[in-house]
Swiss-Prot record:
Species of the source: Staphylococcus aureus (strain NCTC 8325 / PS 47)
Pfam families attached to this UniProt entry: EF_TS
GO biological process: translational elongation
Protein family membership: Belongs to the EF-Ts family.
Main location: cytoplasm
Keywords: Cytoplasm, Elongation factor, Protein biosynthesis
PROSITE patterns documented for this protein: EF_TS_1, EF_TS_2
Protein name, UniProt field: Elongation factor Ts
Gene Ontology cellular-component annotations: cytoplasm
Subcellular location: Cytoplasm
Gene responsible for this protein: tsf
Length: 293
């Protein structure tokens, strides 16, 4: 049997919001497998599905830049929030975003080797900024999207660049509508554009969890199937952008809102600073010592 560490219990609590003893029991029952433990808690009705971005621990900025029919969303990390608010750092983020669009670099590694208009490489530019700002800075990721003249990009930054969203709306040039949908995605955090993007494997997994949940609630087997399909539809609505109630007008779905503009959401990218990353943990005493150096 796997040893269940306090750190593992803490991680499961943060992912599910379940109580400590429930988390410990779930991990014991599943030999310390955190994904199976999440399913166990859900089947028992103790926890909801864990969010995709469980821990936000790094600092930095997300920025969206558009040029004609090309757009990019980029995340650049810093060590502290103080630097993320620094004007020089903000200018660097915009400069890097424009460089991605100009060079169409495919990876972060390839981007670092590209040459800026001043003749220096992006790698050299970052090192210069580190020297000036006094913190480690790094380009974490970026995504380029393209459209036609008949489509629209939507760009939205929340909390000064803590969250950024880039949307692509087909069949409409209404940038305001595309931005409104980007704002919706920033707030609600869907995983997919539509249910067509959800894999059969994910649907079957969710169906099985919901079935066990219903059976554990003591529901008669003859109505479980109907219940599961109803809950599955609700689950898909929660993770698919076009089926969600539009935040600016909950009386219509995102799909219906865009239809009134003659458009259709075909793609989006949502970045939240540091999602999935963990910053080094320090205890309070070490933190104070570090500040006194």
């Amino acid at each position: 049997m796997a040893t269940i560490s306090a750190k593992l219990v803490k991680e499961l609590r943060e992912k599910t919001g379940a109580g400590m003893m429930d988390c410990k029991k779930a991990l014991t029952e599943t030999d310390g497998d955190i994904d199976k433990a999440i399913d166990y808690l859900r089947e028992k009705g103790i926890a909801k599905a864990a969010k995709k971005a469980d821990r936000i621990a790094a600092e930095g900025l997300v920025h969206v830049e558009t040029k004609g029919n090309d757009a990019v969303i980029v995340e650049i990390n810093s060590e502290t929030d103080f630097v993320a608010r620094n004007e020089g750092f903000q200018e660097l983020v915009k400069e890097i975003a424009n460089q991605v669009l100009d060079t169409k670099a495919e990876t972060v590694e390839a981007l670092m080797e590209t040459t800026l208009p001043n003749g220096k490489s992006v790698d050299e530019r970052i090192k210069e900024a580190i020297s000036t700002i006094g913190e480690k800075l790094s380009v974490r990721r970026f995504a380029i999207r393209t459209k036609t003249d008949n489509d629209a990009f939507g760009a939205y930054l929340h909390m000064g660049g803590r969250i950024g969203v880039l949307t692509v709306v087909e069949g409409s040039t209404d940038e305001e509508a595309a931005r409104d949908v980007a704002m919706h995605i920033a707030a609600i955090n869907p995983k997919y554009v539509s249910s067509e993007q959800v894999s059969e494997e994910e649907i079957n997994h969710e169906r099985e969890v919901l079935k066990q949940q219903a059976l554990n609630e003591g529901k008669p087997e003859n109505i479980v199937e109907k219940m599961v399909e109803g809950r599955l539809r609700k689950y898909l609505q929660e993770i698919c952008a076009v089926d969600q109630d539009f935040v600016k007008n909950p009386d219509v779905t995102v799909e219906a809102f865009l239809k009134t503009k003659g458009g259709k959401l075909v793609d989006f990218v949502r970045y939240e600073v540091g999602e999935g990353m963990e910053k080094r943990e320090e205890n309070f005493a070490d933190e104070v010592k570090g500040q006194m150096k």
